[in-house]
Each structure stands twice: as structure tokens, then as C-alpha cells.
């Protein structure tokens, strides 16, 4: 949130349930089964945490004005721009994210938060892909090796202890960049002593929050078309 003194992170959670609980309200009871997002409940928890209305929602999931059944123009454009930096996009499908994406986009739209593609409008929703976002936020040349389940892919010739050490070091480096750009990120992202998917998910959530802040400051660009777009921060 920006209270007039610049952006700062108020809260970050690895799951919907944890986010609602962090708000300190009964909103945790509104989450549907933990894995299925509830747009109304998420907005209510966010309002409780920041003490005001929510201007922009950033989502780390393929979204589109029309049902997603395969690769989109936005996926092709992101891959064209960032594929050489190992941050291309995997193809979405009717199964993944499928109905989950369509339902979430429709829920937010019904609450007045339309999906932004060619221009930013508030209140609104934007799609974020953390890999290219981190490339631009850090200024590094390639996709950062920060996914907990891919250490063998990143460092195939190293033993597990060394791979874990490198992963934790990468997490620490990313947190440093995020804290410098969004105060409060460091407190929300205390690097664990062993890799956890929960930490990785919380890190992605903070990246999305920072991209949303940059968007509200006019420091992003949209890669896509009228149906879908991935919003990427400008370098620096």
C-alpha cells in the first residue's frame, strides 16, 4: 500500500487461507476449500489489511477475456521477448488453468475489477508472470534459478547440500532486491533454513504486489493483445 510516503508491503501469505487469517477477521471462513480463490473474500481481507479500497489486483495465473483453451498471443509475445533469457511461457490449456481462470476473472469483473490488457484501469486486474518480472526488477540477464523443485535442473552436477545452499542464496538475493524496491518485503520473506514451496509461493506473491505497485506508478508495459496481456515492470 501507499500511505503517502511511498509503497510498503503490509502482508504476504503463501495460501488463501493464510492470507484471510492474516487479516484477523472471519474471512478465512469464506475461502472455498483452500485452493479455490474467492474474489470477494480476497478483496475484503485486503481492505481490512490496508484500511482502504483496493486499486489493482495482480494475479500469477493466465487470464483472458475469452476462455483459455490453448496458447495465447500474450504467451507468444512474452516468449519472443524473454525466451532467449530462459523465461519463455509454457502453454496454458482448457484444463490448466481452465475454468479456475475463467471463474476468477468473471468474479472480479462482477465486483468492478475488469481485466486490463491494452491499458491500465482502476480498479482492475492484471496478469503477472514472475520470471520476466524478476529479470527486469533485478537487471540480471537470465531467468533466476529460484524454484524449489528444479534444483536438479539448475545445478545437475552438484550434490543436494550444495544445490540447497545455492537456492537459499538465490532466495536471499531476490529478497534483497524486493526489500529495496518495496519496504516490508524483507520482513515478510525471511529465508528459511531449508527449501519450502510455501516460501517460494510467498515470494511470487510479493513479486506480484511489486509489479502492481509499479503499474500504478506507470512503470510497466503490457505484452499481449486485447484478449490477454502479461504486465512486466520496466527495467530498474
Regions found by a protein language model. Give the residues of each.
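RNase H-like (RuvC/DEDD) metal-dependent nuclease/polynucleotide-processing core
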Residues: 1-236
Amino acid at each position: 500500500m501507499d500511505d503517502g510516503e511511498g509503497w510498503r508491503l503490509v502482508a504476504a501469505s503463501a495460501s488463501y487461507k493464510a492470507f484471510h487469517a492474516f487479516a484477523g477477521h472471519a474471512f478465512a471462513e469464506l475461502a472455498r476449500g483452500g485452493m479455490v480463490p474467492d474474489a470477494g473474500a480476497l478483496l475484503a481481507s485486503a481492505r481490512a489489511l490496508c484500511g482502504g479500497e483496493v486499486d489493482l489486483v495482480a494475479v500469477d495465473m493466465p487470464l483472458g477475456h475469452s476462455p483459455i483453451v490453448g496458447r495465447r498471443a500474450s504467451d507468444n509475445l512474452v516468449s519472443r521477448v524473454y525466451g532467449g533469457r530462459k523465461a519463455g511461457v509454457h502453454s496454458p490449456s482448457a484444463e490448466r488453468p481452465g475454468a479456475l481462470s475463467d471463474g476468477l476473472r468473471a468474479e472480479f469483473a462482477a465486483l468492478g475489477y475488469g481485466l486490463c490488457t491494452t491499458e491500465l484501469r482502476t480498479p482492475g486486474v492484471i496478469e503477472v508472470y514472475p520470471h520476466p518480472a524478476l529479470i527486469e526488477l533485478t537487471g540480471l540477464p537470465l531467468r533466476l534459478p529460484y524454484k524449489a523443485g528444479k534444483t536438479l535442473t539448475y545445478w545437475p552436477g552438484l550434490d543436494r547440500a550444495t544445490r540447497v545452499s545455492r537456492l537459499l542464496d538465490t532466495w536471499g538475493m531476490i529478497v534483497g532486491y524486493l526489500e529495496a524496491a518495496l519496504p516490508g518485503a524483507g520482513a515478510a520473506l525471511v529465508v528459511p533454513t531449508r527449501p519450502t514451496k510455501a516460501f517460494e509461493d510467498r515470494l511470487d506473491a510479493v513479486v506480484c504486489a511489486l509489479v502492481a505497485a509499479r503499474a500504478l506508478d506507470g512503470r510497466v508495459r503490457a505484452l499481449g493483445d486485447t484478449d490477454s496481456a502479461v504486465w512486466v515492470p520496466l527495467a530498474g
